[in-house]
């Protein structure tokens, strides 16, 4: 796998500060499971996947206008209490 560089990502966002904001928002979406990845995972962490998507031009600054979604709820197993 090729390494993702800041320069690759800066072709699709205005500056480094905006890159941090966009990558943060996208990696949170991926980590929480609220959005599906647009590229194959290749055993990457959500942060690396977010940067790969930005470098590929699949994610841009419009993601900052989206609301932050809570994590996908996992059902809790019911516990039995014995008296």
UniProtKB/Swiss-Prot annotation:
EC number: 2.7.7.6
UniProt keyword Nucleotidyltransferase, yes or no: yes
GO MF term list: DNA binding; DNA-directed RNA polymerase activity
One family name in Pfam for this protein: RNA_pol_Rpb6
Entry-linked InterPro entries: DNA-dir_RNA_pol_omega, Pol_omega/Rpo6/RPB6, RPB6/omega-like_sf
Gene3D superfamilies from the UniProt entry: 3.90.940.10
Record's function text: Promotes RNA polymerase assembly. Latches the N- and C-terminal regions of the beta' subunit thereby facilitating its interaction with the beta and alpha subunits.
Assembly behavior: The RNAP catalytic core consists of 2 alpha, 1 beta, 1 beta' and 1 omega subunit. When a sigma factor is associated with the core the holoenzyme is formed, which can initiate transcription.
Protein known as: DNA-directed RNA polymerase subunit omega
Source organism of the structure: Chromohalobacter salexigens (strain ATCC BAA-138 / DSM 3043 / CIP 106854 / NCIMB 13768 / 1H11)
């Amino acid at each position: 796998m090729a390494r993702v560089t800041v320069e690759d990502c800066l072709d699709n966002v205005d500056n480094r500060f905006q890159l941090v904001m966009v990558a943060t928002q996208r990696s949170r979406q991926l980590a929480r499971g609220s959005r599906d990845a647009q590229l194959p995972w290749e055993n990457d962490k959500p942060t690396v996947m977010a940067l790969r998507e930005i470098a590929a031009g699949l994610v841009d600054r419009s993601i900052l206008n989206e609301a932050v979604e809570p994590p996908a709820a996992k059902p809790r197993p019911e516990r039995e209490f014995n008296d």
